């Protein structure tokens, strides 16, 4: 499923990545993804989408719901961060603070599910540029093209464990810019 798709995309479409010749070490013949937890950020666990995004992107954001400022700017291992949006998304959603505050405000149930996070480990053998190209293509084709907003943060502490956090809206955006029913 998901990991096989990523592996195939890495071989076929990552600039500078060449498939090893037949008989080469199996580790060189394909990309291995060792880790892929998927989690839900929900209000009943006392979490907010704004706080989670600030943490993952190592930024400072204000939650307009309760006035809390979340400052994670001292984190130094975020190599790349980007908000990826469907074409019809309101342009202001390119600002992660606006996007996730909109999500927090749109969910009114006390046990509301706010966002989904996907974490993927990447091969240390690829360069940051190759990993970012792979991440962007995967997120675009798998989520954004289906109307989801994605907040992407690529982390590398230099410990041989480069990985990406993909934070997704639970609802797709409709063509008119309004939130659709939840995607489960």
Please provide the spans of the model-predicted regions:
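N-terminal nicking endonuclease/strand-transfer module with a His-rich metal-binding environment
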Residues: 1-184
């Amino acid at each position: 499923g998901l990991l096989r798709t990523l592996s195939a995309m890495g071989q076929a479409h990552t600039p500078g990545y060449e498939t090893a010749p037949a008989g080469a070490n199996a580790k060189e013949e394909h990309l291995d993804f060792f880790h892929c937890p998927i989690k839900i950020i929900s209000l009943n666990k006392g979490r907010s989408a704004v706080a989670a995004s600030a943490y993952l992107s190592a930024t400072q954001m204000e939650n307009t719901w309760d006035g809390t400022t979340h400052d994670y700017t001292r984190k130094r291992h975020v190599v790349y961060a980007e908000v990826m949006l469907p074409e019809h998304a309101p342009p202001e959603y390119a600002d992660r603070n606006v996007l996730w505050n909109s999500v927090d405000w749109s969910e009114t149930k006390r046990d509301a599910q706010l966002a989904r996070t996907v974490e993927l480990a990447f091969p240390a053998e690829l360069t940051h540029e190759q990993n970012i190209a792979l991440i962007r293509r995967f997120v675009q084709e798998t989520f954004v093209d289906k109307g989801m907003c994605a907040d992407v943060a690529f982390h590398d502490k230099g410990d041989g464990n480069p990985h990406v956090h993909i934070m997704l809206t639970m609802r797709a955006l409709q063509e008119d810019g309004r939130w659709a029913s939840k995607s489960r």
